């Protein structure tokens, strides 16, 4: 059996690895494999071009990494300094301890914080008296307002989700983005009560995981184990015996095809083969992002840098949406005497002048950086908007009816690296099973 994999991001490369492990002949097509995931070293600092980590609670990425012999390179976040600041009235306010996303699990930190007004604090306290209910798909904003009020959207849900999904809580689907909390609402009424009853025992491990040499080392390791054609797929065709793939002016024939290039790229390739499926894929909206990384002499930064970084809620925002303080979050990434700031925006065209100026204002930095690095990723972040789960179910049903066609990637069952690996492994197993 020959399998074509269109797209060489983490989903496509993982799928190719799992297929190859089972002796399946597969070819990955991508002119720039790895997608946003990559690493560079500047002035001795290990920097990421895209995602910097994954949630340790989701095991699939770590399982893959250990399987390919990279377990000794696993690195956990420096949770001794696990604190995040949120900008409120122009000042950094520490996010209250005990928050699980938007759900408070400790009373006193919420009482003491200056992040919320007393109206919101009282609302959070009374949330435990809610009755169970099941509602149709609704936005994250509607869900959070219903439970904790509008201020919790502005100063928790919006900044937290903007950095992960690049979208607005008024558009994102609560069941797709916050499935655990929606389940608590259905079972207990109160998401606070649900969180307490489902409290997971501390594992003692870091909340985030990465690789000591950078995420790009995972891409490099997978590329050593797969067959790659560094070319863009210009067209695909459905044959009676399988699939045709056109790349670099040459057609190749395969029995199976895995679309791992994103819903937005898969849609036009499938338009003439399965128009209804193509339309549904095209209906998944995408946003882009820009990551500006600035390096400074530590002596030029007056802040103590005693946290993972900060988030800027929309009411306070100019340009920077989120900023990671790299030397605090990841020990060993930044040499002594330097400070590195990884700044995020959903505007792929944001300029250095705008980003650096905003960082200087927020951090009170007067000096010029010793380096500045930009990575732009337009149309890279699928949006799980209201109705997403129903849309994905319909997409999966239509794809299953097309012999030899498979879809993987972050547009469907989870946006993080572990979710992509899980999707790839499941798809590979289905292909092997026939």
Which residues does each PLM region occupy?
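Hydrophobic anchor at the start of a short beta-strand
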Residues: 3, 24-26, 257, 369-372
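Active-site/ligand-binding neighborhood in enzyme catalytic cores
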Residues: 83, 103, 107, 120-238, ...
């Amino acid at each position: 059996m020959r399998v074509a994999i269109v797209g060489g991001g983490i989903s496509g490369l993982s799928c190719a690895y799992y297929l190859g492990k089972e002796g399946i002949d597969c070819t990955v097509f991508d002119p720039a494999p790895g997608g946003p995931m990559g690493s560079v070293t500047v002035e001795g600092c290990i920097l990421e071009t895209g995602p910097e980590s994954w949630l340790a609670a989701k095991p699939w990425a770590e399982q893959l990494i250990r399987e390919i012999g990279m377990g000794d390179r696993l690195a956990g976040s420096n949770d001794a300094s696990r604190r995040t600041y949120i900008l409120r009235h122009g000042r950094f306010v520490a996010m209250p301890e005990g928050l699980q996303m938007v759900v408070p699990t400790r009373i006193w930190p919420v009482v003491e914080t200056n992040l919320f007004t007393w109206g919101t604090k009282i609302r959070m306290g009374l949330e435990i008296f809610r009755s169970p209910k099941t509602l149709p798909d609704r936005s994250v904003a509607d869900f959070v307002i219903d439970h904790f009020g509008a201020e919790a959207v502005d100063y928790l849900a919006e900044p937290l989700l903007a950095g992960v999904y690049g979208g607005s809580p008024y558009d994102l689907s609560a069941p797709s983005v916050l499935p655990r909390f929606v389940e608590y609402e259905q079972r207990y009424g109160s998401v606070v009560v649900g969180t307490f009853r489902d409290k997971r025992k501390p594992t003692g491990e870091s909340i985030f995981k990465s690789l000591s040499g950078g995420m790009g080392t995972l891409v490099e390791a997978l590329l050593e184990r797969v067959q790659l054609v560094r070319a863009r797929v210009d067209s695909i065709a459905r044959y009676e015996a399988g699939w045709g793939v056109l790349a670099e002016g040459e057609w190749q024939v395969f029995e199976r095809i895995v679309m791992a290039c994103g819903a937005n790229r898969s849609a036009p390739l499938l338009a003439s083969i399965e128009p209804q499926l193509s339309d549904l894929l095209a209906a998944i909206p995408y946003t882009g992002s820009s990551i500006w990384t600035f390096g400074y002499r530590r002596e030029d930064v007056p802040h103590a840098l005693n946290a993972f970084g900060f988030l800027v809620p929309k009411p306070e925002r100019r340009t920077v949406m989120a900023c990671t303080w790299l030397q605090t979050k990841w020990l060993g990434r930044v040499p002594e005497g330097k400070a590195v700031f990884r700044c995020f925006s959903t505007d792929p065209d944001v300029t250095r002048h705008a980003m650096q100026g905003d960082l200087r204002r927020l951090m009170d930095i007067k000096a010029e950086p010793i380096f500045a690095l930009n990575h732009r990723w337009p149309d890279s972040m699928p949006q799980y908007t209201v109705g997403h789960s129903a849309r994905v179910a319909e997409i999966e049903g239509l794809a299953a009816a097309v012999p030899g066609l498979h879809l993987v990637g972050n547009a469907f069952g989870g946006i993080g690296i572990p979710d992509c690996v899980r999707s790839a492994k499941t798809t590979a197993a289905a292909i092997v099973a026939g």
